[in-house]
Amino acid sequence: LLLEGGPLPDLTWTPRYVEIDAPAETLPDLIEAAQKRWPEAVIAARLPLDTETGETAVDLVRRGVRVIHVTGNEVAMDDTGRYLPEAIRDVHGALVDRSLRDAVTLIVSGGIAAAEHVAKAIACGADLVALDFILFVAWGTSLWADRSPSPIEDTDFDAEWGAQRLVNLANAWRDQLLEVLGAMGMREVRRLRGEMGRTIWFETEDAAFKKRLGDSAPLASYPAAAREEAPEGDFRWPVWLLHTTQQMARTGSPPDGHVEYRIGDSDGGFDRLAFTFEMDRDPADVPTADPAGFDMSLPLNRRGDGRPAQRIAAPWYGAGMSYGSVGYPVMYARCRAAMEMGTLSSTGEGGYPDALNEFADHIITQVATGLFGVSEATLQRAPVLEIKYAQGAKPGLGGHLLGNKNTESVAQLREAVQGTSLFSPFPFHSVYSVEDHKKHVDWLKQTNPEAIISVKVSTPTDVDMVAVGSYYAGAHIIHLDGAYGGTGAAPEIAKKNIAMPIEYAVPKVHNFLVEEGIRDEVTLMASGGLRTAYDVAKAIALGADGAILGTAELVAIGCIRVAQCEKGLGCPFGITTTDPEHAKLVDAQESWRRIVNMYTGWLWQIAGILERYGMTSISELRGRSDLLLSLE
């Protein structure tokens, strides 16, 4: 029951919940009267959100109000134009500062339009949310009055159908909220309330990031090459990047500059960064140089601990893709390409197939939380062992392999039951502290005295502390996996909602390692959305030593971003299938040559960037964020 001011109405029924919308000075008296009239009902005060709401809430709680509903507008803003998270944070903070927070239930509404908004509102300080316009959307309303009438205006509206639609929406949101709680290691939503230390605020991170750049420039002033229009691709991989990447994969030559080859069509990330020299250069004039005249190699062991001084010939290697997420021909092609390029490729978390033994010197094998396919024998034959603590596309969640991809050979390698969906737990149940982390690293070092250790983590707000902790635990490589990384199967709410973008994380970690005096004792690798030679160069300029690539290699083979990787026969090109017949669509011999060709084109482009700045080694580019501009 919503009451707008007084006096209280005479009812023939007893409401369960009464909300009073009235001037703040009259609310306590009205609420007291309502409590006497309906003693079994929950009585709440309704307040519009503005800069004074926090103090008003404090006053109401001191005067006995125990439920407060604060409201934003339909686009999740308060009356002053602030977005809902900031407004909620202020109200919650005002109550906490006066030691009153646990004396009141705080309800929030206004523009809550997705499950992620529920989790974020609670993390900012709400106890629960109230839904408004999203209910109309659930019933099929477009929210555009000039487009079509709302189904609820129909005199034949089926109430049971409408109720079931709301139940369906609530169930879907509940499942997504459970994913968030699981990712944060929580079992009760009450623990999420006010957990702002685990939130990432765009304005804060963006301001810190831009301080490290050389300058900014208008986006419209960026001299982009022609951009094609076609249905293939997506915002991060638009058709022009697919086209130029696959052109390099066919020819082994750098792009000709007639089609855009450096940036995609997203509204952030590396698409909003440019090197200073690009701004006054004809995009058709692609800067290239012979990479033979530059030192492109990357040392992986900088600790001087007596283990092999691993060095790869290019500043990147292949990301983890398990047998199960992709088929064997793709695994073969990626490992063969790594051998030809003098770099590495990771098996992912599904085990190390014996058929790849011929590439043993160029393989990273991964130890993830499910321990699928992990054995002493496989650990002892890999030069690099990677502990996968988290993945950028689904931070806080273990790996997923759906049952239709768990074929007989996959199940045999993973020592699992064929046809069942496989979910790696989170976290490692033997690692709950930095000390446990060190024991984990020591276990791998003891198992393989010749291997160097990589630690793969996602990018939470305290990623700099995580990186330093990994260094002191004994890691040689710190692998930061950002939120734009590819994934075959991850909950939608986990993608881009839990961790920060890789371009924010890299300089944050790089500078913290510098301040700790240990930057030159560890190799920092970046992954998660790096698509082009320019992305790699930008990541290095931000502070990474090198990059780790996954999706780009699949695009070189023929991926056009259909985004059905999680399905057994979903990929029309057989790239992400484990079906033995469907996998024959991939020619392993042709595919490894295409990956090598793409990387050859990249080397010429990166050499051109180095030449433009008078550098002779890729290591000279590291940390030169002053050479980057923010495109705004």
What is each model feature region?
Residues 10, 35, 306-310:
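Short boundary motifs at domain starts and secondary-structure transition points
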Residues 413-416, 422-429:
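Glycine-rich phosphate/pyrophosphate-binding loop
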Residues 58, 154-183, 187-190, 202-203, ...:
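Conserved divalent-metal-coordinating catalytic cores
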Residues 3-4, 9, 15-167, 183, ...:
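Glycine-rich phosphate/ribose-binding loops and adjacent secondary-structure elements
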Residues 125, 135-137, 143-148, 152, ...:
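Mobile "lid/hinge" segments at catalytic clefts and subdomain interfaces of large enzymes
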Residues 12-13, 380:
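Intrinsically disordered, low-complexity partner-recruitment/activation regions
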Residues 1, 182, 187, 191-409, ...:
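Conserved, well-structured core domains of diverse proteins
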